């Protein structure tokens, strides 16, 4: 009897300890620090070890030679692209740290992959295949300093830098493909063809009252039905679910002055940005921007909640999403063959027909205990609703008829053709 009790006590003591072994760097440091490259790799190796549905794979290397770890969550499937395509499941790609100072996406991804391993959110894998890339800008992630991202509220021991090792802002490189990191991302799009992509960021700038803001595609040449569904069905549902979880969310924007008054305005239509590039490929892009002036712990929490809400809804709407994408593909092919339609080549922001209620918030200044520099923190009691004009959509101001063919002079063909092939164009 004593021997049985002894082993029972040992087992009970071992189980909680083992469950606590796999913790993220923020969890181990009371949210003072973020994960370095070796931390992320070790975590993903541990979380996938022995799993029959979590598979660790690697994308091409960064400027400084770091391979990018990718976790594929696929139940009952070989994780190769062909098997995933044959499964008929909706493929969703979730990406963190394209700007390496914006680190909560990376940490939220690690937490969510661990939750999947532990049996949570199992319903996602009935309809979805999930591709998790916590750290796209791995070189920038290693340049951790408390002086990066001035005024951001943590992590107080520092975060990575915005550009990659060559000084390129990766979220401006989706057309030129000058960086190995974005080339690896576009290669992933071509191989796995995710229907939906999530790009997880931290805001800069305006003192608003939201925990997180979001955006879909903004280029008017994006398939209109995809854009309509995101504005009328998808984002309203996500906003509702986030409110139920206790988070204030809204469309991404900043305060600007236009025509002598304050307005809420979105950012850019340019395809060099991830959300616009993916949208122009007839896929569904989702941009997430956690508020820089809420604590690091809270930014991880709201980002993880946003991803959960998105994946829950996509699980419910997988058939509808696949239908929308198929229709967008057919529509694009028909337009190209007809030669009768046109595309926008110049664009302008459009003012909303009615004034919109936007949340504003004040911040207080706190001192970073490691650098001594000021950090801003949202004062929750200061959040208030203000009506103002909104600029959330672009319209074409100049359009050009779709060409039937392109002529490339020999002196530029050697540059242009490899770039088109890298994007997946059939030549």
Residue positions per predicted region:
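Hydrophobic h-region of N-terminal signal peptides that target proteins for export
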Residues: 10-18
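Acidic/histidine-rich, surface-exposed loop or edge segments in extracytoplasmic proteins
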Residues: 20-31, 94-96, 168-169, 396-402
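Active-site/substrate-binding loop(s) of hydrolase catalytic cores
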Residues: 85-96, 103-262, 266-272
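Soluble metallo-hydrolase cores and metallopeptidase-like ectodomains found primarily
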Residues: 38-92
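Active-site-proximal beta-strand/loop segments in catalytic clefts of secreted hydrolases
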Residues: 59-61, 73-75, 96-98, 133-137, ...
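Bacterial N-terminal signal peptides that target proteins for export
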Residues: 1-6
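Hard-cation-handling environments
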Residues: 255-427
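Acidic helix-start/capping segments at beta-turn-to-alpha-helix junctions
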Residues: 61-67, 129-139, 329
């Amino acid at each position: 009897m004593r021997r049985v009790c002894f082993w029972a006590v040992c087992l009970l003591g071992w189980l909680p300890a083992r469950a606590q072994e796999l913790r993220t760097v923020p969890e181990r440091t009371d949210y003072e620090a973020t994960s370095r490259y070796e931390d992320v790799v070790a975590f993903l190796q541990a979380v996938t070890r022995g799993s029959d549905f979590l598979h660790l794979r690697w994308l091409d290397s960064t400027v400084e030679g770091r391979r990018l770890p990718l976790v594929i969550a696929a139940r009952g499937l070989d994780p190769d692209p062909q098997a995933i395509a044959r499964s008929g499941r909706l493929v969703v790609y979730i990406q963190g740290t394209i700007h390496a100072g914006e680190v909560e996406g990376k940490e939220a991804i690690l937490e969510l992959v661990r939750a999947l391993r532990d049996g949570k959110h199992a319903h996602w894998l009935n309809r979805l295949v999930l591709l998790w890339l916590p750290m796209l800008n791995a070189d920038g992630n290693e340049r951790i300093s408390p002086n990066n991202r001035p005024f951001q509220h943590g992590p107080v021991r520092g975060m990575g830098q915005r550009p990659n090792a060559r000084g390129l802002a990766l979220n401006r490189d989706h057309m030129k493909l000058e960086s190995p990191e974005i080339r690896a991302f576009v290669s992933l799009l071509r191989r796995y063809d995710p229907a939906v992509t999530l790009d997880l960021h931290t805001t800069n700038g305006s003192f608003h009252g939201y925990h997180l803001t979001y955006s879909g595609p903004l280029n008017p040449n994006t398939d209109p039905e995809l854009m309509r569904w995101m504005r009328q069905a998808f984002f309203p549902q996500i906003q509702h679910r986030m409110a139920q979880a206790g988070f204030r969310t809204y469309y991404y924007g900043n305060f600007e002055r236009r025509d002598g008054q304050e307005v809420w305005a979105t950012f850019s239509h340019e395809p060099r940005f991830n959300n616009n590039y993916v949208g122009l490929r007839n896929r569904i892009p989702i941009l997430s921007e956690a508020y820089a002036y809420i604590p690091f712990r809270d930014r991880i929490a709201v980002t993880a909640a946003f991803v959960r809400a998105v994946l829950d809804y996509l699980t419910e709407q997988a058939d509808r999403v696949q239908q929308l994408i198929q229709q967008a593909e057919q529509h694009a092919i028909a337009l190209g063959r007809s030669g009768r339609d046109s595309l926008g080549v110049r664009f302008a922001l459009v003012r909303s027909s009615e004034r919109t209620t936007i949340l504003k918030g004040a911040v207080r200044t706190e001192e970073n205990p490691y650098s001594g520099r000021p950090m801003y923190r949202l004062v929750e009691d200061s959040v208030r609703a203000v009506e103002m004009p909104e600029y959330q959509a672009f319209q074409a101001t100049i359009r050009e008829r779709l060409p039937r063919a392109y002529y490339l002079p020999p002196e530029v063909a050697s540059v242009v053709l490899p770039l088109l092939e890298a994007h997946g164009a059939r030549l």
